[in-house]
A protein has these predicted regions:
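Beta1/beta-strand and adjacent pyrophosphate-binding region of the FAD-binding site
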Residues: 1-12, 173-183
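Glycine-rich flavin
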Residues: 2-4, 21-173, 201, 206-210, ...
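Short hydrophobic core segments
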Residues: 7-9, 115, 134-145, 179-180, ...
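Flexible, glycine-rich terminal cap/loop adjacent to redox cofactors
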Residues: 9-35, 41, 48, 53-59, ...
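Conserved phosphate-binding and hydrolysis motifs of nucleotide-dependent enzymes
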Residues: 10-15, 145, 181-186, 273, ...
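Short glycine/serine/threonine-rich phosphate/pyrophosphate-binding segments
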Residues: 14-18, 161, 186-189, 195, ...
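Glycine-rich dinucleotide-binding loop and its adjacent helix/turn
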Residues: 47, 144-199, 203, 228-231, ...
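FAD-site-proximal beta/loop scaffold in flavoenzymes
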Residues: 157-174, 262-336, 421
C-alpha cells in the first residue's frame, strides 16, 4: 500500500499548485485525477479554451471590421471553424503537458482514478477498469472543483442545449444563440459566437448583468455589448425548452410574473453558475461536513471537520476563480508544513475577458454604501487617455474608490481594453494598504493605458490632469 505525506484529490489550478508547493516543502506527494488529462475544468473545458476562442474570434472580427481604417487592406476573412477549434486544442494540450512536466519535476505521483475518502489518512482510488486501490497518507486535500449548475426541467445534451463545455466545441456557428444567465461565462462565450456570426440573446433573472460587479461598470458595459449587437432580456427567466422541432423553442416569462413569450433559437447555452463537486467523494461517510449549498466546510486554516483533511478552491466558500484556488493551494500546503500560509480575500481580482475587458478588485460602491463606509471616488475615461485615443480604443473608464478619511484604496474597477492586465497594479497597491495618493504619485510610462489608473487616482483628490 502506497503511503504519502499528502494526497491531493483533483488536479485543477488549486490541486496541482497545492501539490507542487507541498513537494517544494519536502513532502512526498500524490495527486488523484479521475479525468484522462490533468488540469481540471480550467485547463480542459474552462478558462484556457475559452481564452483561445476569445482571442481567435477577436482576430477574426478585427480583420473584418478594423483593419481597413488602419490602412490594411485584406479580402473578407473566411471562417475555418475546425481550424479554430484545433488552435484551441493545441493550447489545451500545451498547458496540460506543462502540468504533467511539473508533476515529474517535483516527483509527484499521479494516480488515475476516482478518489473516495475512507476516513482520516485513507483514500480509495477506483480506476476506469473498476479496480480499486487504497492509498495511505498523513494529509488529504480536497480540490475537486465545481460542476455546471443545471436548470430544473431543461436537459443539457451538449449539442443543442449546451453548458459552457458544449459551447466551447460547437460544430458550426449557430444563426441564433440564446444564453441563460448574464454572468461572466455567458458573456464571454456569447462574445465568441457573436463575433463569428451568431445572433445573441441573453436572458437574465436579475435586472442587471454581471451580478456582484460594480453597478455603474455593469450598466456601461451592457451598453457596449448592445452596440456590438447583443440583445438582453433582464428580469426574465427561461422555464422550458422545446427540442422537438428543427428550431428550439424557449419559454420565457418575467421573473416577477406576467405574459409568457416563446423565443426560437438554434442553440441554448445554460450559464447560471457552478456548484461544488463532491459526488462520490465519501464526505458524509467520512464525517466531512458540507454547508447548505453543498460546499465543504472549512476553518481559517482550510481544515474540514475531519482532522488531517483539508479543502480548497471551488469546493469551498468564496468566489469560484482559478487564481483564488491557486492561492489557497499554496497557503494550505504551507499550513500543513507548519508555516503561516495566508490568503487575502479582500484583494482577489475578477476579470471578464470580452472586448472591452472588465476587471475589478476590492469593494464596489454598492458594498461600501451597504456597509456605511464613507468613501471618495475618482474616475477617468479612456477617451482622455492618449494611447487609447491614438489606437481608437476609447471605450470605458477607470474608477477608484478610497476611504474618505484615510485615502486607503478600497476598490478599483476598470472597463476597457486590456483591463485584465491593468488591474494588477491596483492589487499590489491594496495588498500593501496603499492610498490613492501613493498611486497618484507613482510615475507611469507614457503613452500607456495604465496612465488612466494614475489619472483616476488623481481624480480621487479632484486633480486629474487630462480631464
Amino acid at each position: 500500500m502506497a503511503s504519502y505525506d499528502l494526497v491531493v484529490i483533483g488536479t485543477g489550478p488549486g490541486g496541482y499548485v497545492c501539490a507542487v508547493r507541498a513537494a517544494q516543502l519536502g513532502m512526498k506527494v500524490a495527486v488523484i485525477e479521475k479525468n484522462p488529462t490533468l488540469g481540471g475544468t480550467c485547463l480542459n473545458v474552462g478558462c484556457m479554451p475559452s481564452k483561445a476562442l476569445l482571442h481567435a474570434s477577436e482576430m477574426f472580427e478585427e480583420a473584418a471590421h478594423s483593419f481597413a481604417k488602419m490602412g490594411v487592406s485584406v479580402s473578407a476573412p473566411k471562417l475555418d471553424l475546425p481550424s479554430m477549434m484545433n488552435f484551441k486544442q493545441q493550447g489545451i494540450d500545451g498547458n496540460v503537458k506543462g502540468v504533467e512536466f511539473l508533476m515529474k519535476k517535483n516527483k509527484i505521483d499521479v494516480i488515475n482514478g476516482k478518489g473516495k475518502i475512507l476516513g482520516a489518512g485513507k483514500v480509495e482510488v477506483t480506476g476506469s477498469d473498476g479496480k480499486a486501490q487504497t492509498v495511505e497518507t498523513k494529509n488529504i486535500v480536497i480540490a475537486t472543483g465545481s460542476d455546471i449548475a443545471r436548470l430544473k426541467g431543461i436537459e443539457i445534451d451538449e449539442k443543442r442545449v449546451v453548458s459552457s463545455t458544449g459551447a466551447l466545441s460547437l460544430a458550426k456557428v449557430p444563426e441564433k444563440l440564446l444564453i441563460i444567465g448574464a454572468g461572466v461565462i455567458g458573456l464571454e462565450l456569447g462574445s465568441v459566437w457573436k463575433r463569428l456570426g451568431a445572433e445573441v440573446m441573453v436572458v437574465e433573472f436579475l435586472d442587471r448583468i454581471l451580478p456582484g460587479m460594480d453597478g455603474e461598470v455593469a450598466k456601461q458595459f451592457q451598453r457596449m455589448l448592445e452596440k456590438q449587437g447583443f440583445a438582453f432580456k433582464l428580469g426574465a427567466k427561461v422555464t422550458a425548452v422545446d427540442t422537438s422541432g428543427k428550431m428550439l423553442k424557449a419559454r420565457v416569462e418575467p421573473a416577477a410574473g406576467g405574459p409568457v413569450e416563446t423565443l426560437e433559437t438554434d442553440v441554448v447555452l445554460v450559464c447560471i453558475g457552478r456548484v461544488p463537486y463532491t459526488e462520490g467523494l465519501g464526505c458524509k461517510e467520512a464525517g466531512i461536513a458540507l454547508d447548505n449549498r453543498g460546499r465543504v466546510q472549512i476553518d481559517a486554516h482550510f481544515s474540514t471537520t475531519v482532522k488531517g483533511v483539508y479543502a480548497i478552491g471551488d469546493v469551498v466558500a468564496g468566489p469560484m476563480l482559478a487564481h483564488k484556488a491557486e492561492d489557497e493551494g499554496v497557503a494550505c500546503a504551507e499550513i500543513i508544513a507548519g508555516q503561516a500560509g495566508h490568503v487575502n480575500y479582500d484583494v482577489i481580482p475578477g476579470v471578464v475577458y470580452t472586448t472591452p475587458e472588465v476587471s475589478s478588485v476590492g469593494k464596489t460602491e454598492e458594498e461600501l454604501k451597504q456597509a456605511g463606509v464613507a468613501y471618495t471616488s475618482g474616475k477617468f475615461p479612456f477617451t482622455a487617455n492618449g494611447r487609447s485615443k491614438v489606437n481608437q480604443t476609447t471605450d470605458g473608464f477607470v474608477k477608484i474608490l478610497a476611504d474618505a478619511k484615510t485615502d486607503r484604496v478600497l476598490g478599483v474597477h476598470i472597463v476597457g481594453r486590456e483591463a485584465g492586465e491593468m488591474i494588477h497594479e491596483a492589487c499590489v497597491l491594496m495588498e500593501f494598504g496603499g492610498s490613492a495618493e501613493d498611486l497618484a504619485r507613482t510615475c507611469h510610462a507614457h503613452p500607456t493605458r495604465s496612465e488612466a489608473i494614475k489619472e483616476a487616482a488623481l481624480a480621487v483628490g479632484k486633480r486629474a490632469i487630462h480631464m
